[in-house]
Amino acid sequence: MNSAIRRQQSGAQAVILAGGLGTRMRPITETIPKPMIAVAGKPFLQRQLQLLTHSGIRRALLLVAYLGDQIQEYFGDGDKFGCSISYSFEPSPLGTGGALKNAEAQLQDYFVLVNGDTYLAIDYASLLQDFREADCTALIVAYGKPETASQSVPASVLPANLGVSQDGVVTAYHKRNSEGLNHIDAGVVVLKKEILARLPAGQKCSLEEEIYPQLIAQGELRAWVTSEPFYDMGSPTGLAALGEKLA
């Protein structure tokens, strides 16, 4: 990473969705929030922050809810982890869109949004640079095809959910119907803050179901294709696979 790009990234913001209930990981998550589950000796969220700081991203906003006080107590202001951390607490579960809307006042003009259970070791600096150069509203990380799916679960149970054209425009997003789709949402997307104007305040809503269809219809959602496997630690199988990778 050259010095100019590194300076740009030092002011970039990562937003991590860390408020989920972690129902697939019970009984572990009955007493600790899912992002605090240990992976190879460190809380998973710490692993995510290490990926981001390694790419020069040193500002993080954590969207927390369930047992969020434990997350704040552990990470504090982020200083001892090499970054600056702030928090947005959801009064009740608001979904991906609602959590962002709740944190609107704390968001920069654009930011990289990361699922709180996704481990994806990509070059986040390059992702952000490509977003700036593309001048698009949203740039979603799209992974391979179902036969080369995440190493954390068998390909047979991880269907494609994105349609991507040859010129990198997302043409479809379906969570339940993979027919004709050729890529997988890897759990990372760069967004312009301006999209939040499309969301209602104080209501539960989903980016995937309410915002992505609008962006796709207007040709505003582009894909950043990667061959780097991603890991979903939100299930016992995924957690075990990631633990083996990082051991």
Predicted segments, located by residue:
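Conserved catalytic-core motifs of eukaryotic protein kinase domains, centered on the activation segment
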Residues: P27-E30
